[in-house]
């Protein structure tokens, strides 16, 4: 990838791997191309070609997600594989976040099928009826962020809830 422009680079936590996409101005390695590159081994672990330009990349230790205006795809680094994909209402911001619960279990938050503020939370591997859909706003969501609440909730002895919290925001307020 020497001499190529790259965008949306995400360092993989506790790793020498970086996930990034290309640039629309290039004839090869465009903004529809995604690469997971291991700097320690100096090799490409995974290269993906998508149908639409990539808007966002988020990564955890074992997984990464890429979003376009209408789709989210979740990949595992090892073995390199597509493990989950969702189609959603067109959203220029393509909000998405992921959080690992364990090295083989992950939660995904993304915009839903309704373009007016719907938030969808799902998991991999999926469990029957585990998908949660929330009407989070009256306008499109522009940002989604998970927060691991274990530490916070451990300090609240009367609260028996556990797991990640999720926050949303939009350009409309």
Where are these regions (language model features)?
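General structural concept
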Residues: 1-65
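Canonical WD40 repeat/beta-propeller blade segments in eukaryotic WD-repeat proteins
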Residues: 3-11, 51-58, 89-106, 138-158, ...
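Sequence signature of WD/YWTD-type beta-propeller architectures
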Residues: 3-4, 17-20, 24-33, 51, ...
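Hydrophobic beta-strand positions that form the internal "hydrophobic ladder"
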Residues: 18, 64, 108-109, 153, ...
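Residue-level marker for isolated small/hydroxyl-bearing positions within beta-strands
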Residues: 21, 67, 110-111, 169
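Per-blade loop-tip surfaces of WD-repeat and WD-like beta-propellers in eukaryotic adaptors/scaffolds
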Residues: 31-43, 71-89, 114-141, 149-152, ...
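Asp-box/WD-like beta-propeller blade repeats and closely related beta-sheet repeat scaffolds
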Residues: 44-73, 78-102
